[in-house]
């Protein structure tokens, strides 16, 4: 006679577990419609912005007519800062692959505008916001900010490549990208 010994390590399941039907999330075809370059930009934008920090510095430090700085520095100090920022900016811009230079410059301008917006909001007296309707104010500010952004972007796309003697493709794929913060 054979005796069946109960082994506690073996687990007996009276019924096989019901497997949930596999739920397809999104068909892969939809994802492919987005151009590869755009996908690259989404991942690389923070990286590019960091890499082009000297260019941001250059544009903000009143090294160019487009920059607006609330306080004045001595001319010599500013020239020295601008020269260093310019050299670093050009070095970094040259290292960025050609097809990514335009989105890189775009993201730098975006960062400058957002920074300026935050500064304006910070310095804006609270009393003024209570007197005027905030919704009304936003409606009037938006086209102005969009125009400011477009102006600075157009300037940066001309000035930086010319100054650094690097090629930036004339077709900028991110020209219609909405600006964050609106």
Curated annotation (Swiss-Prot):
One of its GO terms (cellular component) is aleurone grain. SUPFAM superfamilies: Bifunctional inhibitor/lipid-transfer protein/seed storage 2S albumin (SSF47699). Pfam families: Gliadin. CDD domains: AAI_SS. Residues 21-41 are annotated as: 3 X 7 AA tandem repeats of P-F-V-Q-Q-Q-Q. GO terms for molecular function: nutrient reservoir activity. InterPro entries: Bifun_inhib/LTP/seed_sf (IPR036312), Bifunc_inhib/LTP/seed_store (IPR016140), Glia_glutenin (IPR001954). It is found in: Vacuole, Aleurone grain. Keywords: Allergen, Repeat, Seed storage protein, Storage protein, Vacuole. The keyword Aminoacyl-tRNA synthetase does not apply. Sequence repeats lie at residues 21-26, 27-34, 35-41. Seed storage protein. Serves as a source of nitrogen, carbon, and sulfur for the young developing seedling. Belongs to the gliadin/glutenin family. Monomer. This is Avenin-E. It comes from Avena sativa (Oat).
